[in-house]
Amino acid sequence: MSIGKVQINNLNLSQGEITAVENHLLFVGSGKGDKVGKLLTVNTDSDLSGDIAGADGLLAQVTAARDNGGQNWSASVMLYDAEGGGVASWSDAVDEAMELAKVEGVVLADPLSSVSDIEAMQAKSERIMAKYMRPVWFAGRAPAFDADSQ
C-alpha cells in the first residue's frame, strides 16, 4: 500500500484589497450602459470589450496599458455619463473611485479641450492629497491632430 502525498501550491490570485498602490492606475472615461458609476477592477484576464463596451477611447487606452503591462497587470476603471447620468464628469468619477480604491495615478481617456482642464486636474490632485493624504498624478489625453485646423 502506498503512502499518500500532499502538494501545496501558493498561488497569487490577486484577490482582496489592493495593498500597494504602485503601478495601479485608475482609467476614467465617458461611456454608456450599466457600468457607468461603478468601479471596475480589471486585469489581464478581463474581457475589456465586454466590460467597457461603448467607451471606445477608454477601451483603447486600457487595452494598450494591459498589452504593455505584463502578466500581473491590473487597474481600476470608472465610466461616467457625459450626457447627464449620476456620475456626469470625470471629476465626479474620480471622487467616487477615491472612496473605493487607492491608486498611484489617474488616466483621463477623453481628450482635454482647454487649459482649464489641465488646471482642473492639478486642483483635483491637490484635493485628493488634502483629503486622503494620497499623492496622485494625472495623465490627460491630448486631442487628435487635425491637419486642416493646424
Which residue ranges define each predicted feature?
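Surface-exposed assembly/interface segments
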Residues: M1-Q150
